[in-house]
């Protein structure tokens, strides 16, 4: 498009004359395009590969979407909120899925707390209905089962890191104390994991006799036990040490070995065996 610049002092009659000339039909021009026009056309042609359709705005945005970046660069390239957004799938009217993901993380305080939430914890949250609740809960359960499967493949005493990861995912962020038994076979491979006691923030009743009875029923040769401290502090209490001694001695009467007792927090664990207390 061409623009005509009119100076402030230009004669009005000249303006009318130009108007009459503009109204007359213009003769076809055979003028050769200017060098500037040719250069502009050449640059425009060079910017677009021959035969390729022009890149659309949607295509350019697609390169920046989390799904595309995950497939191209791996999941480590995404933030916590972006990974949660992929699970949620879509947002709400006026709020995109990324805003919803950030809201969820802020509501629960951390990614671990979000993924450890029970189905009832999502009730009343705008944008999180039964379908999305099921997806979030299922993802964590799949991770737990994968770690348990890994624990069954080799002796647990040979892979303490796998035990730590499994226990932190299992009970590390529970809001109440939970006592867990990992029943092992003669080769110290995982046979079964069971929660044998539940308590409050500071108190829990554990019955060694019931644990021994269950170990015999599963034909277990050894046990690893664990409980969480909701406070996050993993230093064992005097009651924890006393329970460990009682349980170790009760299992020894039926020739079952207590290999370790873990105290589990959200980001750390304490091993009685490593401390030399078993």
Swiss-Prot record:
Residue positions of motif JAMM motif: 227-240
Organism ancestry: Bacteria, Pseudomonadati, Pseudomonadota, Betaproteobacteria, Burkholderiales
Positions annotated to bind Zn(2+): 227, 229, 240
Bias (Low complexity): 22-59
Record domain MPN: where: 156-278
GO terms under biological process: proteolysis
Key words of the record: Hydrolase, Metal-binding, Metalloprotease, Protease, Zinc
Protein name, entry field: UPF0758 protein BMA2230
Any one GO MF annotation of this record: metallopeptidase activity
Residues covered by region (Disordered): 1-64
Entry-linked NCBIfam families: PRK00024.1, radc
Family classification: Belongs to the UPF0758 family.
Membrane-spanning segments: none
């Amino acid at each position: 498009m061409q623009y005509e610049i009119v100076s402030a002092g230009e004669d009005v009659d000249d303006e009318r004359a130009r108007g009459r000339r503009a109204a007359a039909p213009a003769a076809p021009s055979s003028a050769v395009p200017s060098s500037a026009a040719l250069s502009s056309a050449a640059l425009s042609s060079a910017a677009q590969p021959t035969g390729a359709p022009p890149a659309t705005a949607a295509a350019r945005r697609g390169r920046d979407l989390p799904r595309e970046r995950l497939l191209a660069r791996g999941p480590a390239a995404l933030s916590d909120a972006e990974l949660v957004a992929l699970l949620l799938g879509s947002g709400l009217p006026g709020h995109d899925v990324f805003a919803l993901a950030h809201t969820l993380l802020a509501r629960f305080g951390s990614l671990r707390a979000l993924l450890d939430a029970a189905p009832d914890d999502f009730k009343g949250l705008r944008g999180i209905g039964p379908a999305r609740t099921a997806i979030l809960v299922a993802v964590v359960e799949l991770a737990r089962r994968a770690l348990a499967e890994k624990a069954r493949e080799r002796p647990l005493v040979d892979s303490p890191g796998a035990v730590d990861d499994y226990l932190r995912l299992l009970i590390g962020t529970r809001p109440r104390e939970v006592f867990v038994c990992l029943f092992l076979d003669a080769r110290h491979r995982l046979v079964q994991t069971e929660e044998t006691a539940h308590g409050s923030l500071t108190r829990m009743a554990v019955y060694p006799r019931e644990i021994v009875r269950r170990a015999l029923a599963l034909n277990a040769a050894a046990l690893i036990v664990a409980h969480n401290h909701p406070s996050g502090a993993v230093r064992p209490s005097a009651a924890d040490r006393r329970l460990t001694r009682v349980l170790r001695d009760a299992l020894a009467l039926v020739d079952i070995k207590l290999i370790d007792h873990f105290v589990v927090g959200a980001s750390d664990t304490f091993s009685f065996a490593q401390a030399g207390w078993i």
